[in-house]
Amino acid sequence: MKKLTVYLATTNPHKVEEIKMIAPEWMEILPSPEKIEVVEDGETFLENSVKKAVVYGKKLKHPVMADDSGLVIYSLGGFPGVMSARFMEEHSYKEKMRTILKMLEGKDRRAAFVCSATFFDPVENTLISVEDRVEGRIANEIRGTGGFGYDPFFIPDGYDKTFGEIPHLKEKISHRSKAFRKLFSVLEKILESENR
């Protein structure tokens, strides 16, 4: 299979590294050569992921992958959801987590990290989107320094440590890992059928 070069529609170096680590051999992942402003005004992770991929793809005139992901806390009606990155945007994630911990006092702590991943090729006009999640709960305190974002207070189901305490496992079980592996699988099937 011919190697496919894909730009990631992000300037977040953590995301680039996380996706590069799980990318198949037939795909070369590159960070976007330029920062492109995309207003993430969708009501769902899927809408934002598709919008990012299409805007980046049309501007770069090259295949791109984008994602939108975030934390969904069930007892807070899905908050912060698509606003995960923009919630208290001027504050650190540590401050955001402290605020959420206060909001959760006396409430159910079930939560999920959700990721929608999209591939867009503007030349072939191919658009593929998938979504996956990892279920878990919010810890009673911030624990661990690994990972990024809300990782230090999210405990995935089946574990007693936060993603911040087990960053080496996160690449295998995270929402982003699951969504992108699913996307790679769909892409591989399409590419194999085109090469026949």
From Swiss-Prot:
Q: What does this protein do?
A: Pyrophosphatase that catalyzes the hydrolysis of nucleoside triphosphates to their monophosphate derivatives, with a high preference for the non-canonical purine nucleotides XTP (xanthosine triphosphate), dITP (deoxyinosine triphosphate) and ITP. Seems to function as a house-cleaning enzyme that removes non-canonical purine nucleotides from the nucleotide pool, thus preventing their incorporation into DNA/RNA and avoiding chromosomal lesions.
A cellular component annotation (GO) from this entry:
cytoplasm
Q: Name one GO biological process term.
A: purine nucleoside triphosphate catabolic process
- What's the protein called, per UniProt? dITP/XTP pyrophosphatase
The cofactor note from the UniProt entry for this protein is: Binds 1 Mg(2+) ion per subunit.
Q: What is its EC number?
A: 3.6.1.66
Q: Output the SUPFAM superfamilies linked to this UniProt entry.
A: ITPase-like
List, alphabetically, the CDD domains matched: HAM1
* Keyword terms of this UniProt record: Hydrolase, Magnesium, Metal-binding, Nucleotide metabolism, Nucleotide-binding
Q: Does the keyword Metal-binding apply?
A: yes
Q: Name one GO molecular function term.
A: ITP diphosphatase activity
Give the quaternary structure.
Homodimer.
Q: Which residues of the sequence carry a binding annotation for Mg(2+)?
A: D68
Q: Which cofactor does it need?
A: Mg(2+)
Q: Which Gene3D superfamilies match?
A: 3.90.950.10
Q: What reactions does this protein catalyze?
A: XTP + H2O = XMP + diphosphate + H(+); dITP + H2O = dIMP + diphosphate + H(+); ITP + H2O = IMP + diphosphate + H(+)
- What family does the Swiss-Prot or TrEMBL record give for this protein? Belongs to the HAM1 NTPase family.
The EC class name is hydrolase
Which source organism does the UniProt entry give? Thermotoga maritima (strain ATCC 43589 / DSM 3109 / JCM 10099 / NBRC 100826 / MSB8)
Positions with a binding annotation for substrate: T10, T11, N12, P13, H14, K15, S69, F148, G149, Y150, D151, H175, R176
Record: active site: D68
Parts forming coiled coils? none
